[in-house]
């Protein structure tokens, strides 16, 4: 039974091929007299053509694999539950962000209070500036943008985190 390598492993292999073939192409660019040599010219030109083709194919594979990996990451992030999405977006401010989101929406992505929507109850203007979405991750990322733009404080929100004593 043959094991199929993961897209990440395949990407690593293709990146190694890109580096190798770029090195070969660079060698012939830096040693162009070799391409015109009566003794080695035909073989050098053939090797340069092969490396150029391999390089183009590997670069295409790298682009395709990166697209696949981005799609996998996107699907994984879209499926995150609210707590995990908030912690992914806010990192070291996770605890504070969870407190604010709990107070604002009880961690419900569909929460609505007038014009205020989502986990962090962002208004229409804030959603226009910082984004919004239907998933917990989209909403958490938008709220994090707002948080950073406000100087990394919670002044835009009605609810504030309770800071633990240091």
Regions flagged by a language model, labelled:
Residues 1-98, 160-166:
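Intrinsically disordered, low-complexity
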Residues 80-166:
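Peptidoglycan cell-wall recognition and remodeling modules
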């Amino acid at each position: 039974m043959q094991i199929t390598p993961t897209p990440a492993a395949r990407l690593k292999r293709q990146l190694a091929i890109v580096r190798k073939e770029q090195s070969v192409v660079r060698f012939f660019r830096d040693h162009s007299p070799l391409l015109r040599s009566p003794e080695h010219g035909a073989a050098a030109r053939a090797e340069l053509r092969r490396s150029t083709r391999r390089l183009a194919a590997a670069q295409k594979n790298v682009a395709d694999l990166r697209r696949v990996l981005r799609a996998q990451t996107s699907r994984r992030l879209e499926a995150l539950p609210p707590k995990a999405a908030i912690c992914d977006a806010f990192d070291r401010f996770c605890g504070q962000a969870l407190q604010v989101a709990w107070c604002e929406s009880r961690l419900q992505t569909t929460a609505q209070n007038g014009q205020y929507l989502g986990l962090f109850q962002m208004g229409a203007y804030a959603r226009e500036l910082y984004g919004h979405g239907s998933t917990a991750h989209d909403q958490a990322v938008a709220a994090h943008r707002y948080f950073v733009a406000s100087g990394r404080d919670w002044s835009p929100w009605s609810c504030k985190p309770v800071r633990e004593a240091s």
